[in-house]
């Protein structure tokens, strides 16, 4: 099956988590917006004939299925791409971890747009500075510390055990994103999460 990934052409964003899984598995897929432009994504969202219309990208077309929301897409793709545990409990555990990553993505976004997404970063700098301070003081230690604990208890080198899963790829992308957005803060913090960084390096 050839998958179709719909996102925006100029940013990695939430679409990158899906893209990483497709690339890791060597899946047959087309990155629609990067091939045909953003109008293709907008057109799919606006299509009135859909019984279950997607709210926003990323969106994956898999045959007749149209699946939206990053964690939902990965929950579908994981077993099919060999990037998820085989048993139901393991698949739900991977999904639970991905949903936690989804929460973290929202918090990272809000450090730059704490007031509203409709304003430019430059229009909300004071609020962004405050949000960033709280983010690094409270949220990063709690959430990345949680993943450090998960790795310590997983029984292997990966979040779900001994095999690479889509959640490992997503945590890799989180580290990459934090290094890009907050290079100095992340460099200081990394010594507190050696297992997470080791996972990043393995991926």
Task: Show which residues each predicted segment covers.
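GST superfamily/GST-like fold recognition
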Residues: 94, 159-184, 192-197, 203
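Glycine-rich, acidic and aromatic/proline-enriched surface loops and short helix-turn segments
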Residues: 103, 149, 177
């Amino acid at each position: 099956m050839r998958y179709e990934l719909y996102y925006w052409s100029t940013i990695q964003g939430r679409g990158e988590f899906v893209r990483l899984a497709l690339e890791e598995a060597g899946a047959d897929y087309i990155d629609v917006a990067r091939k045909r432009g953003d109008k293709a994504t907008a057109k799919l969202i606006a299509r009135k004939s859909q019984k279950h219309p997607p709210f926003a990208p990323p969106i994956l077309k898999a045959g007749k299925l149209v699946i939206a929301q990053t964690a939902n897409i990965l929950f579908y793709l994981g077993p099919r791409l060999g990037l998820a545990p085989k048993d139901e409990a393991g698949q739900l555990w991977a999904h639970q971890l991905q949903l936690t990553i989804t929460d973290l993505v929202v918090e990272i976004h809000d450090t730059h747009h704490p007031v509203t997404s409709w304003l430019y970063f430059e229009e909300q700098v004071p609020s962004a500075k405050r949000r960033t301070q709280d983010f690094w003081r409270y949220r990063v230690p709690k959430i990345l510390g949680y993943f450090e604990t998960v790795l310590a208890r997983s029984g292997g080198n990966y979040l779900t055990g001994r095999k690479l899963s889509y959640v490992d790829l997503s945590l890799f992308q989180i580290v990459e994103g934090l290094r890009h957005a907050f290079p100095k803060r992340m460099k200081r913090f990394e010594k507190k999460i050696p297992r997470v960084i080791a996972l990043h390096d393995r991926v």
